[in-house]
């Protein structure tokens, strides 16, 4: 795969501080831009629920593995975003057995300068097509490596193009050993 000048060389196996594993954390509603504006849905997680070293990590794009599970202690609820739109939290009750497997992910840790965010976020794009949204479900995931630093973009199209390149890089790396077998940690 052709590398971009900003891409960080990915080692043959994870090097410190990787792998970083999380416990199960909540999936929360973000700004609604991933699916609606970019066509790239993301699962947003509260950074304060993650291991402390995540907040100290360089901003940018990472890759790893993730596993979803329903949060069956909850009943469906309607949540309101800051923009007034409504999101149904079904707490993962509609996840099929297959959708509870382990999937490759691309993660963004940062401020999303294209959107001028004022709060650092962690957003995961899970490389799988899901039948339903799963706000409120639980997700456990790993950080296995770093693809590139966070960038600002002049156009939405350039951002989308780079995200698609990130997805290709992550998919390629995660299908090689030892990265592939690290999905068993989840």
Swiss-Prot record:
It catalyses: riboflavin + ATP = FMN + ADP + H(+). Its EC number is 2.7.1.26. One of its GO terms (biological process) is riboflavin biosynthetic process. SMART domains: Flavokinase. Transmembrane segments: none annotated. One of its GO terms (molecular function) is metal ion binding. Its cofactor is Zn(2+); Mg(2+). Zinc or magnesium. Keywords: ATP-binding, Flavoprotein, FMN, Kinase, Magnesium, Metal-binding, Nucleotide-binding, Transferase, Zinc. SUPFAM superfamilies: Riboflavin kinase-like. The active site is at 123 (nucleophile). GO terms for cellular component: mitochondrion. The keyword Repeat does not apply. Mg(2+) binds at residues 42, 44. The keyword ATP-binding applies. Pathway: Cofactor biosynthesis; FMN biosynthesis; FMN from riboflavin (ATP route): step 1/1. Belongs to the flavokinase family. Catalyzes the phosphorylation of riboflavin (vitamin B2) to form flavin mononucleotide (FMN) coenzyme. This is Riboflavin kinase.
